[in-house]
Amino acid sequence: MQEKYLVSVIIPVYNSSLYLQDILDDVKKQTYKKLEIIVIDDGSSDNSLEIARENERTDQRIQVYSFQNGGQSRARNIGLRIAKGQFIRFIDADDRVPADSIENMLSPVANSDSIDMVIGNFISNSPYGLYSGNELENTEISDRQFAQLLLKTPRAFYFGAPWNKLYRADIIRENHILFDEGIAWCEDLLFNLEYYQCCKKIHILNCKNGVYQYFVRDTGATGGIKNNKVEEARIEEIRYQKLLEYFEQYDLQEELKLGWKYINFYYRLTNCVKRETGGRSLRKRYKTFAEMLTPEDAYEYICLRENDYDPRVHKMLKKAMEKKQIHRMFLIFLFKSWMASHFTKTMTFIRKHAHLRIPTDY
């Protein structure tokens, strides 16, 4: 590919010393070389800044900036103000990127000036059944077609996260689009919704290895916020209102309202089986769970949600609902919750200790 575009890669960093060198190596080894790599350290207390500085000394494309604890949104906004490229790519310091990621994402826009954004599929170690776009075909779609696609899974990382997308810098600058520094999570989706409203054509990209590898970490970064029910409710309301505002452009607000009911019902079921939110007693959690499934439309609620994320679980739930096996459904949700919690901690432990050797002299 002819390297006529400068791509600004923005990497916010905070206490990421375990993973930072890996992601910097990934970016430096991209098959597309015309990059401006902007690393924003947000007051790390480990040696992340030293790792970044060392890479800056050996690769002239890397620029390192250090600020004190402004949060990820502020770090990204600083990167946007510094960026000089025609295209913007966001990457998190604790994930990985395939070597051909940027080249693959640039290919559609290199052949068409009318494409405002490229969204690619990703690979994840998440046990949550994330919607990753792997089943979508390579295609160029209109803004209305995209809105209808987003409507199916409005809370999915595929649409909300910034790291699987290629943005046009002029659209961001001309429309003064920035990350909201006043909220601790969901700011990615709000940023994207503003950007989506400026798009006429979007290219859906599907690559064999994805354009990004997303790792779930047991960092607790938003745990404190999400345990604050008042703040969680405030942010949920902001998210809902922004989505409503977006879908009103296409007269799809009623579809969103209905879908939102399905989603909230599923999350209430998920929360009531958790020990930390549903109560210590398993009997009490089961009773609450069973009471929620008494309405006649409960089957439609639960199966619609699961079908979008995990077809295998959907089949089990459908079978259990048809036979009125509430206890079986409870066990499915309980197991999913347990797996999600322990998988994250286990994967974090493995990654942290991957460098250790197992003794063989025993």
Task: Give, region by region, the residue ranges found by the protein language model.
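Cell-envelope/extracellular polymer assembly enzymes that use nucleotide-activated donors
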Residues: 5-8, 36, 190
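Short, well-formed alpha-helical segments that are part of the catalytic scaffolds
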Residues: 15-29
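A conserved acidic beta->alpha catalytic loop
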Residues: 41-50
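Glycine-rich, basic loop-to-helix element that forms the pyrophosphate-binding segment
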Residues: 66-83, 104
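Donor-binding/catalytic cores of nucleotide-activated saccharide
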Residues: 72, 93-231
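Short aromatic/hydrophobic "clamp" motif used to bind/position activated sugar donors
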Residues: 88
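Catalytic core of nucleotide-sugar-dependent glycosyltransferases
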Residues: 209-218, 223-254, 265-267, 271, ...
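Membrane-interface aromatic/basic loop that binds lipid-linked glycans or pyrophosphate carriers
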Residues: 275-362
